[in-house]
Amino acid sequence: MLGISLTVLFSALAAFAVWSYYINPALKSNVKKDNNAMYIIAAAAVAFILRLILGAVYRGHNTDMSCFIGWSNAVFENGFGKFYTLDMFHDYPPGYMYVLYIVGAIEKLFGFSDGAQYALVKLPAIVCDILAGVLIYKVAKKKFSDGLSTVFASLYLFNPATVVNCSLWGQVDSVYTLFILLMIYFISEKKMIYSYFMFAICIFIKPQAFIFTPILIFGIIENVFIKDFSKEKLLKNLGFGVSAIILMVLLALPFGISNVIDQYTTTMASYPYLTVNAFNLWGALGKNWEGLSSFTTVIGYVFLIAIVAYSVYVFFKSKNNAKYYFVGALLAFMTYMLSTKMHDRYAFPAMGLLLLAFVSVTDFKNFIMYALVTLSQFFNTAWVLFVYEKSPNDYFRSAPVLIASLIIFLAR
């Protein structure tokens, strides 16, 4: 626990120093004179090597890594069609199984084991983390210099919460998060057609992506119906939206449509608990791993409806493109904090979205929210990985972080 606390302290001091001595003065001077792509290339390379080394030397979360290694071998050896019929635990939709098939093939070809195997299994998530940082750089580059844009990207590339998630834990939240970021980026750029396919891929990788459905609906309302509406535009968007659904069906075919439907329904119904190690409202109340009742199930839905209603209010109140990123972060973080059946890592996409909101409209509140959500996610994932696995009864309640984060979100 001391190591976790020291990492938080160091990260907070580093973030404060970066803001005070670089970002804030650079924003005030608003200088955009350098044009050197080597900045982002160097930062991305260092972040990639760091993640790869950490991924190789530390196995990760025992249960999750065992699942990914086992699934990669099973899907490669048995094929897509038999995977969901095997007598083994599997709670992921088919999207990531395509990735694990390639991982399994490489593992069999080269006979990787131990550190090399750990790094290989974590590699897709690591690559997606780096690409998310590059996307943040791309968005920032529209307004700022290469140097400052790289600093913004580095706030994500070297974020301790993102490093722990993919490199140490071995989870794949960064994979579907990349497609969430791309979906919302395309919506903010009024490129709705691309966003439909990004959303389809998100859903195909992780059903938690359904949380972001309101963002896609907001984009359709604003970019298809409100701005320059025409029958041709509507039909074009409808056609590509249907095409995205057809893509999902085609990708599901090798696994068997009925198997995929069963997998989604089983996954959505799994973990019927108030919270699963999440540092949220239910965790702060001491309800970790407590089973759902009819009453708490209704309360969870009430919270979810309230969150969506609040996101509608915030979205249509805002007047700039950063609202897409901010409302996406709001949906992710508020759902994680208030809804039931939430896991420790479910607020992960909020970090990248808040950073994109900040670089789009450099409001200091966005930076503070990014720091608080990072603090919450790092504490949660690091605690589960390094403390909880060894002492499951030692549950840490993060009420101060929860309260501070909720106040700033609600005061928006």
Predicted feature residues:
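Aromatic/glycine/proline-enriched transmembrane-helix motif characteristic
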Residues: 28-31, 35, 110, 266-337
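Perimembrane helix-loop-helix junctions
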Residues: 212-245, 349
